[in-house]
Amino acid sequence: MLIDRLAGAVPAHAWPTITVAGAVMVVVLLMRYLDYDKKVEVPVIGPGGRFTKWLGAIRNVWYAREAIHEVANGQHGKLGFQIPTMTRMDVFICDRALTREYYSLDEDHMSFRAVMSEEFQFKWLLPGQHHDVHRIPNSVIAKALSWQRTRASKADDPFFREFSAEFLYGFQEEMRAFTGCGNKSRLPFFSHAGDHTSGNSGWIAAPCFPLALKVIARLTTKSLFGEPLCRNPKFLDMCCEFGDAVPRDAMILRCFPDFIRPLLARFLAAPRGVKELQTVVLNEITSRRNSREKNPMKDLLDFSINWIDEHSADGWEDWHIADMMTNTVFAALHTSSQLVTHTLFELATRPEYVVPLREEIRQCFALYGNGTKAAIDAMHKMDSFIKETQRCNPLDASALARLVLKPYTFSNGLHVPKGSFIFTPNSPLFEDEQFYEDAKRFDGLRFARMRDDPKRKSDSPMTATSEYSMHFGIGRHACPGRYMVSDEVKLVMVHLLLHYDFAMANFGPRPKNMAFGKFILPDMQAKVWLRKSKDAGNTARVDPGAPDGVASEPS
């Protein structure tokens, strides 16, 4: 082989010199790669010198969140700051007036799309969604979701009834799989059944996040694609694998220089997953085009097909839909699944909330109908508990990410050059007594009581956005899918509360969150104990997935 010949041609005594020279070259290249400039005149948190900031960058791989909280808690100036990462300086604007100034700018100046393209490496992992390519505007999926939300609110429209029924079917299927009675998934962390605990207690220990992910995948694909795809086990696994691969592969690519990324991407899972998903979606589009006159518009895929037909003169084609839908799958799955997991962890370790939440569910079903959208929307205590869970377990320590595409000077004279990455602190706001009384304490009914305050009533729903609650962004880039997230999480929790008792495995404490950089994630391996509820068994049981007025047996 060529390598063997080259090795044989090099004298043995030369190898130590070559090894040292190679190591020096690697260090020089690494230092050159990390030798980015401090471009914005705000303080650097931690080492910020030309050849020392990489020490801070390495620390921030694990502790960026702590650094952001230290600054926001008043240890540094209130205007802004920056922290070194492995590839750049992340600039944080703390001043509220300046924050409003930058997030209100148009995409040509400060781009949300561009920063998402960089964070998730769309150029290599999802090329059709890269910020500078011809792609279906975000406003289209927003309009589609608004259309679906309107359908859900109409009592005579079957959409929400079918959506909640799909949840019940999906939950029962996944529980059968976890208890060894159903089809096994090809995914490694779904391949094992839930464990039956010892004795005759009736408890089953199920992996919480995998169960949440599969159920949310069924609901999301129901909304996006409808049947038969939302009931296709292989397609569901593909969606889950892809949703997991994109953030993981993006993190890997960001650790390497630009010139290495296209080569490395060939060996990653996300590019393969994108092709698999898009092939399935394109085949479904072709099938629907062949039978469109026979079928009404039922889901977001139908809406998108109609949209590109109406705008075909602008060069839109079916593969643009496949790109958009694939991106939506990635964006939707983990957000909802992590929130379900966090919420279940909180409720399993706070049993004092179980009775009032169960009572509210039954009252709302009695007033507005079993499983109706009106009943789900009337559950203010449930909404509050989920939002408080979000407040205490925010995914990202930052919010309102933007990439500066044109140099910009703020009204106070602060200049940010092209290429700067701009953020504002997010999670520190949830610990600020200025916005949340007794902010360090978990209060599951905090936002339910807030509805009685005329000044804060509009900020109390889970889907509301404000400058001190930016889970879903704010302004023109606020997440249009937040209403679907709310419905999905509530359907899961309503069903569990009506039909199950639950606790953490071995009646232990809440599993600790996992921190990485600016992010925290729930423990993906933790198990929750589930048991058919005796309390539910002694009452007339109702279910979000059953027809109005019909009691359903627990799965």
UniProtKB/Swiss-Prot annotation:
Q: What is its main location?
A: membrane
Name the chain's protein. Answer: Cytochrome P450 monooxygeanse terQ
Region named Disordered: 535-555
GO biological process assignments: secondary metabolic process
Q: Which UniProt keywords apply?
A: Heme, Iron, Membrane, Metal-binding, Monooxygenase, Oxidoreductase, Transmembrane, Transmembrane helix
Loss of function: phenotype: Impairs the production of terpendole E and leads to the accumulation of paspaline and 13-desoxypaxilline.
Question: According to its UniProt entry, what is the function of this protein?
Answer: Cytochrome P450 monooxygeanse; part of the gene cluster that mediates the biosynthesis of terpendoles, indole-diterpene (IDT) mycotoxins including terpendole I, terpendole K, terpendole C, as well as the kinesin Eg5 inhibitor terpendole E. TerQ is a C11-hydroxylating enzyme that converts paspalline into terpendole E. Terpendoles biosynthesis begins with the synthesis of geranylgeranyl diphosphate (GGPP) by a yet unidentified GGPP synthase.
Per the record, its GO cellular-component terms are:
membrane
Q: Which gene encodes it?
A: terQ
Q: Which residues bind heme?
A: C479
Protein's pathway = Secondary metabolite biosynthesis
Topology term for the membrane: Single-pass membrane protein
Question: Which InterPro entries does this entry report, sorted A to Z?
Answer: Cyt_P450, Cyt_P450_CS, Cyt_P450_E_grp-IV, Cyt_P450_sf
Which prosthetic group or cofactor does it need? Answer: heme
